[in-house]
């Protein structure tokens, strides 16, 4: 569904990206439409803005959903204090149950539950739009504007990739953590998939 939205949303975001270029816009250009990460790259290409000016907001809801499952299932409880969310929201999401005591199988199970939680809500007859609007949109945007740690997509290695970061006077500060090899491999796979999207 998200990639089906890409063509139309890319056209729309390109209009605003060109307006930003024409007006020599110097603020943040924040993308909240799906698919967030590829649209950020489209904005960067069309706008002439610096990569630090473009930011995507889609990962916050994935982090919030992971917290929900971590509170409900003791197997995922380590996510509450040591867990992290990376990448886009959707199929290429990467969750780590813990960065200190990473369990690949548990992390993949949590990732699968979170990535498909919206489908479970739809089965119950609800369209999940409030949680993303708050977690990825309003709350994450406010944290970003205040210079506080939050989940958003920033430019990294030629793609926009979601991770915990904050805006400082010097630019974007990404959270730096020692990551286990299995987690690094998952992140590389996600980056490669994002890079393949035109």
Feature map (PLM): residue ranges:
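Rossmann-like NAD(P)-binding element
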Residues: 1-27
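Conserved active-site and cofactor/substrate-binding residues in soluble primary-metabolism enzymes
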Residues: 7-11, 15, 38, 133-140, ...
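Alpha-helical scaffold segments in soluble metabolic enzymes
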Residues: 15, 19, 42, 69, ...
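Short amphipathic alpha-helical segments, especially helix-boundary/capping motifs
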Residues: 15-20, 41-45, 111-118
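Short C-terminal domain-edge/linker segments immediately following a structured domain
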Residues: 20-21, 60-63, 114-116, 196-197
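Short alpha-helical basic/polar micro-motif
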Residues: 28, 34, 136
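Rossmann-fold dinucleotide-binding core
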Residues: 31-101
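Long, compositionally biased stretches enriched for glycine and/or charged residues
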Residues: 72-198
């Amino acid at each position: 569904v998200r990639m089906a939205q890409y063509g139309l949303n890319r056209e729309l975001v390109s209009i605003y990206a060109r307006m930003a270029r024409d007006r020599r816009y110097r603020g943040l250009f924040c993308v909240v439409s799906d698919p967030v990460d590829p649209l950020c790259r489209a904005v960067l290409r069309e706008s002439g803005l610096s990569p630090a000016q473009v930011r995507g907001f889609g990962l916050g809801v994935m982090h919030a959903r992971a917290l929900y499952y971590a509170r409900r299932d003791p197997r995922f409880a380590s996510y509450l204090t040591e867990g992290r969310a990376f990448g886009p929201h959707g199929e290429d999401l990467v969750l780590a149950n813990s960065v200190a005591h990473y369990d690949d199988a548990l992390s993949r199970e949590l990732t699968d539950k979170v990535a498909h939680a919206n489908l479970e809500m739809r089965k119950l007859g609800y369209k999940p739009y409030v949680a993303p609007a708050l977690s990825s949109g309003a709350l994450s945007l406010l944290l970003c504007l205040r210079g506080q740690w939050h989940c958003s997509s920033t430019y990294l290695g030629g793609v926009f990739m979601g991770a915990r970061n904050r805006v400082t006077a010097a630019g974007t500060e990404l959270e730096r953590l020692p990551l286990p090899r299995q987690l690094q491999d998952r992140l590389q796979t996600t980056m490669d998939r994002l890079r393949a999207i035109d």
